[in-house]
Structure formats: C-alpha cells, structure tokens
C-alpha cells in the first residue's frame, strides 16, 4: 500500500479563508492614502503570505492517501498524532468528481465521497490529480456495462433560462442608466426647499438610481449562475447500471456524479412556469448527504420511456387538488408580507418620489409571482400513497416539487399547533439518511395516519 500526496490545490481552501487577514490592512491603508504606511503594510503582508505558504506546505507534507489491495480508500494525517480514515466502496451512497476550469488547468480534481447515512458536513472531500481521482472512483464505485443516454433537454432548458435572463438584465441595465441620467445636480438651494432631513434629501437624489443598479447587479449575478449551469449541461451524458445511476458533463468545467440506486432517498421532479412553457422537466436525485445542484437528467414531454428506464420505481404524485378546507393561511405569509410592503412603497412613491416607482414595480411583480406560487402550493401541496410508494407534492417559491420516496429508512415527524389540532391538520417532516429533511405543511391528519400505517406494515 503506497501512500501518495494530495494535489497542491488541497490548500486552496485554507489560503482563501486567510486572504482577508493580509488584505484588510492593505485596503485600509489605500483608502487613507498613506504611502509610507503602504510600503510597511506590503512588507508585512509579504512576510505573512510566506508564513501561510509554509503552513500550507506543512499541511501537504503531513497528509496523504492510499488505496489498498482490497479496494479500501485511506486518508492519512500525521501531525503530532496520527489520524486515519478508511472508506470501502460498500459504505458509499454516492460520489462526485468536480473539475472547475482552474482545476482542469492544473490537472486536479475534487473527489467528494458520501458515506451511507452521513450528513453533508461528514462527507470526505479530497483534491487529487485527475488520473488518481478517476482511479479511486472506479475502484470504489466501478461502472460495469453502463447503458448510456444523451438527453438534449437540459441544454435547451438552460439556454432558454439564459436567454430570458439576458433580456431581463439588459432591460434592468437600461433602466439603471436612465435613472442615473435623471439624477439632478447637487444644488443645495434646490434641495433645501425640501423640508426634510439630510437623509431624506440624499435618498431623493440617489435612491432611484441606486435601486436600479442594485437590481441590474442581481440580474447579472443570476445570469452568471445560469451561464455556469448551461456550461455544465453541455455534452451531458446519463448512464445506469445494475446498481448505479449517474451523469457527467460540462464544457469549461467537468462534473461527474455516481449514485448507488439502493441508497437513493428520493427523486424530485421540479416543475416551474418556465419548465411548463418549454415542456422540459428536470429530475433531481438525493442519496444520503449528496444533493447535487444540477439535475440528474432533464427529459422532454414524450420521453417518459427514458424516465421509466432510469428510475423504474418512480411514481408521480396523482394530478389531484389537495383538500383546502380549514387549511392554514401560513402558505401566503413568506411572499405576501414583502409583496404588500413593496406594493405600499410603490403606491407611496407614485406621489412622493415618482422616479422610484418603475424600479419598485420590479420587486413588486417578483413577490407577486411568489405569491401566485404560494397560492398554487395552497391548492396542490399534499401526501399520497401510490402503487406502494409514498409520494408528496410541496411548493417552494416558483417550483412545485413532485417527490417519490425510495429509501425505506425514513423518519416521519408530525407537529401540530393547537389551532391545527382543532381542525384536524398537521405539518409532516420526513427525515432521510444524511439528515435531509422535507416538510409538507398543513395536511389532513388522516393522510398522515395513512403514511404512518404504511410505514408500520412495510
């Protein structure tokens, strides 16, 4: 059993966390424009950086990994005391190999191992050379005669989202430019006519443009996130074997996920207004503490055969409306309160600060859409038993989650307030291996009792 060194990128997380330690004093000196102190700060930062590099070199020297003849992965740490962690392939619920662009340029891969039943914080993440990461993955979770599929729905869905975001961000940018041009020149005599405090005069001058630029920045960041998602869906491939299901893809960065089918906690089909429009449905799979941010695959309407081949045990919740009699109105609180506040501010700004009205309409419409989603959840969220499977539907923002439970080891927790007990309703929380929780709100108590009876008999 030969011990090997980790990739030097292992210390990137340590260096990133300590970056503020030696940059904060430098920024303070630059703002003060004290050039004498700047040279002193640069020398101090250089010494501190050398010290951190020495610590990083020590971390790399005392840490190593190995793979023995029986296929057990060992991670070693020797600094005063010896710590070893060992994982067999049978102990894993899933593994992921992530290679962002910077990692690809350095020939590195981030290998994350998800033990069965372990929470997200107890996963094992190591940075290895590309060939070593692939060898460890093939040893722990080998692919035996995989059946490959290349669904094209994910790329088009991501491209559709990206195009819509680009148009909306462009509109926000144009609005921000117009608001900036409309900012009046700073004339104390003019602003003195406004019989309010200095803070109110400052808000009257800068708030419309500042709010518009803030919305434009939020749209740009969302676009960057969608661009990253689109880049990861290029050349996307899904496979399944007798005991695994997984996917890989990416353009600038590569991502690979392998999931043991016997350890899948639940599968989630997320329905959004955009998904309904394009008729492409993303499917997410959770196994243990592994909940990838990317869908396992995206299928189009008419390609249900591929869905059934990849996840033959999945059962979609029935297309029924939930019982809404005596249901709690708490569904509307998270979106209704900010919607009412934004609507009130919009009405007030129409008379007090008209330049801000158009900008305030954007968050008002946004929270209005969330309120419409809450209304859909009020009518659709519920629990059903279907063909020997527990299925549920829950609303989160604009997404309607259609979930089928796979894993038998699930904890059901029913919580009732006095008001809910009086009307025969309760909140049900499902806790899966890895401490992943799903909550269904204000469901009839008899439906929850059916779930409990099903768990006792199965």
Question: Where are these predicted regions, by residue range?
Answer:
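N-terminal basic, Ser/Thr-rich segments that initiate or prime the first beta/alpha elements at protein or domain
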Residues: 1-458
């Amino acid at each position: 059993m030969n011990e090997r060194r980790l990739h030097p990128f292992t210390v990137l997380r340590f260096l990133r966390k300590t970056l503020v330690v030696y940059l904060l004093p430098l920024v303070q000196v630059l703002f003060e424009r004290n050039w004498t102190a700047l040279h002193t700060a640069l020398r101090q930062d250089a010494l501190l950086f050398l010290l951190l590099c020495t610590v990083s070199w020590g971390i790399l020297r005392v840490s190593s990994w190995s793979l023995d003849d029986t296929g057990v992965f060992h991670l070693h740490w020797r600094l005063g005391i010896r710590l070893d962690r060992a994982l067999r392939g049978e102990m894993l619920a899933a593994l992921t190999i992530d290679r962002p662009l910077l990692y690809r340029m350095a020939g590195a891969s981030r290998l994350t191992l998800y033990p069965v039943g372990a929470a997200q914080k107890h996963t094992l993440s190591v940075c290895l050379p590309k060939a070593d990461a692939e060898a460890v993955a093939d040893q722990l979770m080998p692919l035996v005669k995989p059946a490959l599929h290349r669904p094209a729905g994910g790329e088009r869905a991501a491209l559709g989202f990206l195009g819509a975001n680009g148009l909306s961000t462009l509109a926000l940018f144009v609005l921000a430019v117009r608001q900036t041009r409309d900012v009046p020149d700073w004339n104390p005599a003019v602003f003195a006519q406004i019989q309010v405090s200095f803070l109110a005069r400052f808000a009257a001058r800068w708030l419309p443009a500042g709010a518009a630029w803030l919305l434009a920045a939020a749209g740009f960041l969302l676009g960057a996130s969608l661009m990253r998602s689109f880049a990861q869906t290029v050349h996307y491939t899904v496979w399944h074997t007798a005991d695994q299901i997984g996917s890989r893809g990416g353009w600038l960065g590569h991502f690979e996920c392998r999931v043991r089918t016997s350890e899948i906690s639940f599968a989630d089909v997320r329905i959004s207004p955009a998904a309904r429009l394009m008729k492409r449905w993303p499917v997410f799979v959770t196994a243990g503490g592994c909940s990838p941010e990317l869908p396992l695959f995206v299928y189009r309407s008419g390609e249900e055969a591929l869905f059934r081949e990849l996840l033959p045990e999945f059962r979609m919740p029935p297309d029924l409306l939930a019982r809404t009699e005596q249901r709690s109105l708490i569904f509307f609180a998270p979106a209704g309160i900010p919607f009412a506040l934004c609507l009130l501010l919009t009405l007030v700004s129409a008379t007090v600060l008209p330049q801000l009205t158009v900008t305030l309409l954007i968050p008002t419409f946004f929270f209005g859409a969330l309120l419409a989603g809450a209304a859909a959840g009020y009518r659709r969220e519920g629990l059903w038993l279907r063909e020997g499977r527990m299925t549920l539907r829950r609303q989160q923002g604009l997404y309607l989650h259609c979930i089928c439970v796979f894993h038998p080891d699930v904890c059901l927790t029913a919580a009732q307030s006095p008001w809910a007990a009086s009307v025969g309703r309760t909140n049900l929380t499902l806790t899966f291996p890895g401490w992943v929780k799903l909550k269904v709100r204000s469901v009839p108590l008899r439906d929850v009792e059916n779930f409990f009876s099903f768990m006792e008999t199965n």
